[in-house]
Amino acid sequence: FDENKIKNIPLKGYFMKKEYPRSDFRSVSDVDILFDRKQADSVKKVFSELGYTFLNEDDNQYHFEKKPMMNIEMHATLVHENEESYPLLVNQLDRSTKRDGYSYSYEMSHEDFYIYMLVHNSNHFRIGGMGARMVLDSYVFLKNHQSELDYDYLNVMLEKIGIAKYEKRVREIAFNWFSKPHAELKFD
């Protein structure tokens, strides 16, 4: 992407694998990357040159596959435009910081990453359910970053997006399942 000047943010599993004590503790079934929709033709060209097949696009994702098992989801937006959280998450490419060693690859703040992870997981929960890995991801992320998170910002954003209660429940479940007795992380 750097060579083709495609601004991007790797999402979810790409960074979560690095949060675990060993990367093989966290599986990924596809790679999700946020990009600027205006660069869709360049993205298609790059993946074609790398041997990927363009499968389809929907209102916010472009899907690519390379057999036998590599799947890429290029996200033009973090959430669908009709979702309540869209206005709060739409400018993530502009809000993120450049990753070390890259000219066009960025990363979200820890707070925005956690918020996006929760929004993504809550959509799965609402549509069809979520598994233990999503709860474990929350636990691992919070354990790794609890001392550096801006909880005032998180509380405000979680309320605005409408997932504050959801976040609290997921956090309670995560710490009940995966921590020593009585360990708890509070946001207040």
Model-predicted segments: where are they?
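Conserved NTP-donor binding/palm subdomain of two-metal-ion nucleotidyltransferases/polymerases, i.e.
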Residues: F1-S29, F35-D188
